[in-house]
Curated annotation (Swiss-Prot):
Residue positions the entry lists as glycosylated: N56, N106, N212
Function text: Component of neuronal acetylcholine receptors (nAChRs) that function as pentameric, ligand-gated cation channels with high calcium permeability among other activities. nAChRs are excitatory neurotrasnmitter receptors formed by a collection of nAChR subunits known to mediate synaptic transmission in the nervous system and the neuromuscular junction. Each nAchR subunit confers differential attributes to channel properties, including activation, deactivation and desensitization kinetics, pH sensitivity, cation permeability, and binding to allosteric modulators.
Keyword terms, alphabetized: Cell membrane, Disulfide bond, Glycoprotein, Ion channel, Ion transport, Ligand-gated ion channel, Membrane, Receptor, Signal, Synapse, Transmembrane, Transmembrane helix, Transport
Family statement: Belongs to the ligand-gated ion channel (TC 1.A.9) family. Acetylcholine receptor (TC 1.A.9.1) subfamily. Alpha-2/CHRNA2 sub-subfamily.
Membrane topology annotation: Multi-pass membrane protein
Cytoplasmic side: 330-484
Oligomeric form and interacting partners: Neuronal AChR seems to be composed of two different types of subunits: alpha and non-alpha (beta). CHRNA2/Alpha-2 subunit can be combined to CHRNB2/beta-2 or CHRNB4/beta-4 to give rise to functional receptors. The alpha-2:beta-2 nAChR complex is proposed to be a heteropentamer with two subtypes: LS (low agonist sensitivity) with a (alpha-2)3:(beta-2)2 and HS (high agonist sensitivity) with a (alpha-2)2:(beta-2)3 stoichiometry; the subtypes differ in their subunit binding interfaces which are involved in ligand binding.
Bilayer-crossing regions: 242-266, 274-292, 308-329, 485-503
InterPro entries found in the cross-reference section: Neur_chan_lig-bd (IPR006202), Neur_chan_lig-bd_sf (IPR036734), Neur_channel (IPR006201), Neuro-gated_channel_TM_sf (IPR036719), Neuro_actylchol_rec (IPR038050), Neurotrans-gated_channel_TM (IPR006029), Neurotransmitter_ion_chnl_CS (IPR018000), Nicotinic_acetylcholine_rcpt (IPR002394)
Annotated organism of origin: Rattus norvegicus (Rat)
Name this protein carries in UniProt: Neuronal acetylcholine receptor subunit alpha-2
Length: 511
């Protein structure tokens, strides 16, 4: 019974407290809402949003201006535009929007639609596309002192002069110029909130990095008007991140340039030197077409990568011309060209030593011919036969001499015809001391004379072919030496061209 009475007392007291507190809270909230309603009526009852918020016409509205960048969306090199997502921080004082917080339930600030109050007509002067002014009219923050704080977001496309000299290792200087479009400095003046762009809320770009972003205050007199107009100009120094272009453009271009060097190491006999040159030239043409789609169409400067591609295309074109010349030299013969002495001395003697080229000696000069050699008189052909075979053949010859017809008018020297298991063999006979009567009695048959003439013809033909082959080999070696000269020359030029590609942006501090 006691517990029930205590519980009843507790719930009774709780109910009484609720009856006392809830109306008080509701009354306070209602009075606060009522205070804001009264404040709105007080402020905007006779408010004119088209008049400047100054007590006197000669007074100047001071607008404090600042810029906060949220994102660097894009830099269009071809159309020379920079697209940014920014917040325009603006602050000014409107004397018609002041109140005493004590009279309005201690309300110190209000959020009011920006369409209801006077706002400065600050626009982007160097706008390239889209709206010059802010399109999304957010609410303004109004304080009891009359201070209005307005931070509308905007996406601007500002014109930017793109310098592609060191593309893709380039650094661009873009600007955004803000100012009042209709009010001159006597009506509205600007002050900078900060000397730099606010990067606290900046979202990093995957292609560009903001190196520096500062603002300056300027006053300028334009040709259209006699008044002076103030502006705040923000200068952005942005640097391209070159990894994408290095992997997809520069490295393939360098590799293709190296293929040009291999053209001079490719043997002329393979018949693919011209094909390789043309393939490299077509590949470079494709890369040049890709670059023309990226960089702006300007005749002021040529981008560094464009210069390198143009240099490589000239490089490849020269390699085609040189390859045609080398192939022409390679296929020369004694019947078409005579080798000048200076070519023989320079390209067969001195230059190969400078290039560390060692030409192997031909087998004839190393070991001599194992099967065939000429007699000192160049009239007889002697084979390398065994002494036993010669003696047997001489005995057979003596037996057959009885059946040989005798003719007159033979030469002074004698000749032996040897028949062995290897076929017909001729050898030079040692001159013997014979009397005139014996010399006049040595006769040969017409068949043997014809055979000897055929052997002489074959020997002369072989000597001529050996001489022609030697000259052809000399021309081929000259072509090889010319190839080696341009191989080293093109390696040096390719190396210097690559250094020339990376050195200027490196010295400029862009790499």
């Amino acid at each position: 019974m006691t517990l029930s009475h205590s519980a009843l007392q507790f719930w009774t007291h709780l109910y009484l407290w609720c009856l006392l507190l809830v109306p008080a809270v509701l009354t306070q909230q209602g009075s606060h809402t009522h205070a804001e309603d009264r404040l709105f009526k007080h402020l905007f009852g006779g408010y004119n949003r088209w008049a400047r918020p100054v007590p006197n016409t000669s007074d100047v509205v001071i607008v404090r201006f600042g810029l906060s960048i949220a994102q660097l969306i894009d830099v269009d090199e071809k159309n020379q535009m920079m697209t940014t997502n920014v917040w325009l921080k603006q602050e000014w004082n409107d004397y018609k929007l002041r109140w005493d917080p004590a009279e309005f339930g201690n309300v110190t600030s209000l959020r009011v639609p920006s369409e209801m109050i006077w706002i400065p007509d600050i626009v982007l002067y160097n706008n390239a596309d889209g709206e010059f002014a802010v399109t999304h009219m957010t609410k303004a923050h109004l304080f009891f002192t009359g201070t209005v704080h307005w931070v509308p977001p905007a996406i601007y496309k500002s014109s930017c002069s793109i310098d592609v000299t060191f593309f893709p290792f380039d650094q661009q200087n873009c600007k955004m110029k803000f100012g009042s479009w209709t009010y001159d400095k006597a009506k509205i003046d600007l002050e900078q909130m900060e000397r730099t762009v606010d990067l606290k809320d900046y979202w990093e770009s995957g292609e560009w990095a903001i190196i520096n972003a500062t603002g300056t205050y300027n006053s300028k007199k334009y040709d259209c008007c006699a008044e002076i107009y103030p502006d705040v100009t923000y200068y952005f120094v942005i640097r391209r991140l070159p990894l994408f272009y290095t992997i997809n453009l520069i490295i393939p271009c360098l590799l293709i340039s190296c293929l040009t060097v291999l053209v001079f190491y490719l043997p002329s006999e393979c018949g693919e030197k011209i094909t390789l040159c043309i393939s490299v030239l077509l590949s470079l043409t494709v890369f040049l077409l890709l670059i023309t789609e990226i960089i702006p169409s300007t005749s002021l400067v040529i981008p560094l990568i464009g210069e390198y591609l143009l240099f490589t295309m000239i490089f490849v074109t020269l390699s085609i011309v040189i390859t045609v010349f080398v192939l022409n030299v390679h296929h020369r013969s004694p019947s078409t060209h005579n080798m000048p002495n200076w070519v023989r001395v320079a390209l067969l003697g001195r230059v190969p030593r400078w290039l560390m080229m060692n030409r192997p000696l031909p087998p004839m000069e190393l070991h001599g011919s194992p099967d065939l050699k000429l007699s000192p008189s160049y009239h007889w052909l002697e084979t390398n036969m065994d002494a036993g075979e010669r003696e047997e053949t001489e005995e057979e010859e003596e037996e057959e001499d009885e059946n040989i017809c005798v003719c007159a008018g033979l030469p002074d020297s004698s000749m032996g015809v040897l028949y062995g298991h290897g076929g017909l063999h001729l050898r030079a006979m040692e001159p013997e001391t014979k009397t005139p009567s014996q010399a006049s009695e040595i006769l040969l048959s017409p068949q043997i004379q014809k055979a000897l003439e055929g052997v002489h013809y074959i020997a002369d033909r072989l000597r001529s072919e050996d001489a022609d082959s030697s000259v052809k080999e000399d021309w081929k070696y000259v072509a090889m030496v010319v190839d080696r000269i341009f191989l080293w020359l093109f390696i040096i030029v390719c190396f210097l061209g690559t250094i020339g590609l990376f050195l200027p942006p490196f010295l400029a501090g862009m790499i």
